[in-house]
């Protein structure tokens, strides 16, 4: 050990000597003349070597573990950067691929080539910014899928399910159920299955469905005790099965389904219960002037506050003594906890009041016929008793009021004190039910009336015209058929008359054929004119002019048939002669005269003219007068000329009457 230290010292001294020689050689060659301060250079060298030694010592003292930790941290950071760069490159590739696919599909749908798509893709890749990094969501991992159960576990699970189902069925079987017979106000009954989970509101809803009534808020279940002669209505929140369970097996009690305005009268007119006792004169005026807004505010103040406000009721009532039929008059006060009375010789202060009954375990009932049964002062009684008391008992309290108004106020006040806000909630639920039912009813009536209007409207509109037009058409067609038949019969008679007088036949039709205009224009003008047309005078032969029948008697033939038909000759010249001075007798009387006295008549006029007359040419009354026309035109020419003026006046009056009738009909 001593030798090694000596060797080190020797080596160190040798090194120092060599360093001195080196510095001397460098100073002789390069440096200027020696500096007056050579010891400073030695100091610098000695200082530098000292710093080197200190740095070496510091390196030796430094912890290698810390260096390794730093190195590992640098390596991990580099790896993270590499992984991040790879992710970004993959995202860019996916984004560019999706963009390329969308652009290519759009270009393909528009009919562009692949070159355009490629250029568009490259352009979009250059212009688009890099996609944002995926947000890191701290979402819980989905639960692992359940492991498949073994056969034993499946059997155990199935057994547990069966046990659970059996327990549910057992629980359902334990639910108490009753068959309730509900009496209607028309003496009919409805049977309902009611279980212990149903409230009176549920039973009412079932009855609404069965009876199809209007779901008014006044409908209620009404409980009647014939033995005690008391009755009441169920509150909507009461359990029906619990109440019916208190009845005895041989009871005569009944449940009715009827309307009672007293059930929710306080919510319709709250001023009658809250403001009635503050002043009789003021309350009457207030009751008359109370509007809906004030009623609503009064209800909110009474039922929607921190505590329920019970009506301030107090007054003298008659109390039935226990076990007796005698009644005593006492002064009672209504409070939220019960009814109190003022003992004899005491005041109405709270410390002097005595508790009469509390509302916790009693129900309120109306008394019926208590004046007859219990010798009550009036028939306006109410009763307070426990629900389980079904027969006469000393624990039943009977009170009697002076009038119906006082009775209703006390009964409603007791209900408000007993049920509180629940009563208001029941009313709101009943109103909502009634409003929903009314909306459905209105919707049903609107839907039912909508198809009825178009069905009845056109029906009535069509029946009136169809009832009139067919009748008119039928009458016109019947008249035309009758006229045609009459014309055919007269046509059969006309050739017979013409055969007897052949020499006179050919003269009349051929002479005026070319000179006279066709008659239809004259007839048409007479048709359209309001007054009878004046017939034109024809230049015919013969001294006596025969009268042409008025145009009103002749149906105007349509223009085409008489012009185009060569078989129909024009009317005779005598047709246009002035009216005669006499009125020809009716056609039936001429039939016998024509065969013996009359000269040969001219050829018959065209008989089928009345047949083709259209229905719209003339009104039905004018057409009805057409049948007698052919006989007049045949037989008038045979009369000698000359007639009186009185007959002409008669003819003109007849024409005016017919024209007036036509105007009334049209």
UniProtKB/Swiss-Prot annotation:
It is found in: Cell membrane; Cell projection, Lamellipodium; Cell junction, Focal adhesion; Cytoplasm, Cytoskeleton. Widely expressed with high expression in thymus, spleen, lymph node, bone marrow and peripheral leukocytes. Gene3D superfamilies: Phosphatidylinositol 3-kinase Catalytic Subunit, Chain A, domain 1, Pleckstrin-homology domain (PH domain)/Phosphotyrosine-binding domain (PTB). Pfam families: PH, RA_2. One of its GO terms (cellular component) is T cell receptor complex. The keyword Acyltransferase does not apply. Residues 129-148, 547-589, 598-631 have a biased composition (Pro residues). Residues 122-155, 448-666 are annotated as: Disordered. PROSITE patterns: PH_DOMAIN, RA. The modification Phosphothreonine is found at residue 528. It comes from the Eukaryota. Keywords: Cell junction, Cell membrane, Cell projection, Cytoplasm, Cytoskeleton, Membrane, Phosphoprotein. InterPro entries: GRB/APBB1IP, PH-like_dom_sf, PH_APBB1IP, PH_domain, RA_dom, Ubiquitin-like_domsf. Induction: By all-trans-retinoic acid (ATRA). Residues 453-478 have a biased composition (Polar residues). Residues 483-504 have a biased composition (Basic and acidic residues). It is a peripheral membrane protein. Its main location: membrane. Residues 310-419 form the PH domain. PANTHER family: AMYLOID BETA A4 PRECURSOR PROTEIN-BINDING FAMILY B MEMBER 1-INTERACTING PROTEIN, GROWTH FACTOR RECEPTOR-BOUND PROTEIN. Appears to function in the signal transduction from Ras activation to actin cytoskeletal remodeling. Suppresses insulin-induced promoter activities through AP1 and SRE. Mediates Rap1-induced adhesion. Interacts, through the N-terminal Pro-rich region, with the WW domain of APBB1. Interacts with RAP1A, PFN1, TLN1, VASP, VCL and ENAH. Belongs to the MRL family. This is Amyloid beta A4 precursor protein-binding family B member 1-interacting protein. It comes from Homo sapiens.
């Amino acid at each position: 050990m001593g030798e090694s230290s000596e060797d080190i010292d020797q080596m160190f001294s040798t090194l120092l000597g060599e360093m001195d020689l080196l510095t001397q050689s460098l100073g002789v060659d390069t440096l200027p003349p020696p500096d007056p301060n050579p010891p400073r250079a030695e100091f610098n060298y000695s200082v530098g070597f000292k710093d080197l030694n200190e740095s070496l010592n510091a390196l030796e003292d430094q912890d290698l573990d810390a260096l390794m930790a730093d190195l590992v941290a640098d390596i991990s950071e580099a790896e993270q950067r590499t992984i991040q760069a790879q992710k970004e490159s993959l995202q860019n590739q996916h984004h560019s691929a999706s963009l390329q696919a969308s652009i290519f599909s759009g270009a393909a749908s528009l009919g562009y080539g692949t070159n355009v798509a490629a250029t568009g893709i490259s352009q979009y890749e250059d212009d688009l910014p890099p996609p944002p990094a995926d947000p890191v969501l701290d979402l819980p991992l989905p639960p692992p899928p359940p492991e498949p159960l073994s056969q034993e576990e499946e059997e155990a699970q199935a057994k547990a399910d069966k046990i659970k189902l059996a327990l549910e069925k057992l629980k359902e079987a334990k639910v108490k159920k009753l068959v309730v017979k509900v009496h209607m106000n028309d003496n009919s009954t409805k049977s309902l299955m009611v279980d212990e989970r149903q409230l009176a509101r549920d039973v009412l809803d079932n009855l609404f469905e069965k009876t199809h009534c209007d779901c008014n808020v006044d409908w209620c279940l009404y409980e009647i005790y014939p033995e005690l002669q008391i009755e009441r209505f169920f509150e909507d929140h009461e359990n029906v099965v619990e109440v019916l369970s208190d009845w005895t097996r041989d009871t005569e009690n009944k449940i009715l389904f009827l309307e009672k305005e007293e059930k929710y009268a306080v919510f319709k007119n709250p001023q009658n219960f809250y403001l009635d006792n503050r002043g009789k004169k003021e309350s009457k005026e207030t009751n008359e002037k109370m509007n809906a807004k004030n009623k609503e505010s009064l209800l909110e103040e009474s039922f929607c506050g921190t505590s329920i406000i019970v009506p301030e009721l107090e007054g003298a009532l008659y109390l039935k003594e226990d076990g007796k039929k005698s009644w005593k008059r006492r002064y009672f006060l209504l409070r939220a906890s019960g009814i109190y009375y003022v003992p004899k010789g005491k005041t109405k202060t709270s410390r002097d009041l005595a508790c009469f009954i509390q509302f916790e375990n009693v129900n309120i009932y109306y008394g019926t016929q208590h004046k007859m049964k219990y010798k009550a002062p009036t028939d306006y009684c109410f009763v307070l008793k426990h629900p389980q008391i079904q027969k006469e008992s000393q624990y039943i309290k009977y009170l009697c009021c002076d009038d119906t108004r006082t009775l209703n106020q006390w009964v409603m006040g007791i209900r408000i004190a007993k049920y509180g806000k629940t009563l208001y909630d029941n009313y709101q639920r009943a109103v909502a039910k009634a409003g929903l039912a009314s909306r459905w009813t209105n919707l049903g009536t609107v839907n039912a009336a909508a198809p009825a209007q178009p069905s009845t409207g056109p029906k009535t509109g069509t029946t009136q015209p169809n009832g009139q037009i067919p009748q008119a058409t039928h009458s016109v067609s019947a008249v035309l058929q009758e006229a045609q038949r009459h014309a055919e019969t007269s046509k059969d008679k006309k050739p017979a008359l013409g055969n007897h007088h052949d020499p006179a036949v050919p003269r009349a039709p051929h002479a005026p054929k070319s000179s006279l205009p066709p008659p239809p224009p004259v007839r048409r003008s007479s048709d359209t004119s309001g007054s009878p047309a004046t017939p034109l005078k024809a230049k015919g032969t013969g001294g006596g002019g025969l009268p042409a029948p008025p145009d009103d008697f002749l149906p105007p033939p349509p223009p085409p048939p008489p012009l185009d038909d060569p078989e129909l000759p024009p009317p005779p010249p005598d047709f246009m002669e002035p009216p005669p001075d006499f009125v020809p007798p009716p056609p039936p009387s001429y039939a016998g005269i024509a065969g013996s006295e009359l000269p040969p008549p001219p050829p018959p006029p065209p008989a089928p003219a009345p047949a083709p007359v259209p229905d719209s040419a003339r009104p039905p009354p004018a057409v009805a007068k057409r049948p007698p026309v052919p006989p007049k035109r045949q037989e008038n020419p045979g009369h000698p000329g000359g007639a009186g003026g009185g007959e002409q006046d008669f003819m003109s009056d007849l024409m005016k009457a017919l024209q007036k009738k036509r105007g009334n009909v049209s």
